[in-house]
Amino acid sequence: IEFWRGVPLITVLFMSAVMFPMFLPADFFIDKLVRCIIAISLFEAAYVAEVIRGGLQALPRGQYEAAKSLGMGYWRMHIFVILPQALKLVIPGIANTFLALVKDTPLIFVVGLLEIVGMLNLAKTNPEWLGFAMEGYVFAAIIFWIICYAMSKYSYNLEQKYKTER
């Protein structure tokens, strides 16, 4: 986990897109999109794991002891007592991590894959679209804002539904 958290996402994407194929056998091929999805997944999983670890550490020791006193085994204790409480506590942190993931998607343009900002950069070089770059950027900003606002409102609603304050 510390490795993935200690390396910038742009470096992880560059390594997955450019360096990783150099270490594969010549007849073995993994598409660049798949490599980037795996790299982003590993990167974001490290951050989500840290958020969940924080939630687990925030629970009082008494919760563990109470579950053990009821005769629950390790897995049963975690599935039915500990994780539901910890996940309820970390809703804001997980939502923040997913919002950061959405905001990090334009970085895949650096390794040659296109997303909304990458397509905009490609379109503004087209002679038919000269002079319309500002409108494209405004449109992209509105799309990102709508997605992030919707995710933020959903997170807020989850917090209210489950009363995540301590």
Go through the PLM ranges and name each one.
Residues I1-R166:
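Transmembrane alpha-helices and adjacent helix-loop boundaries
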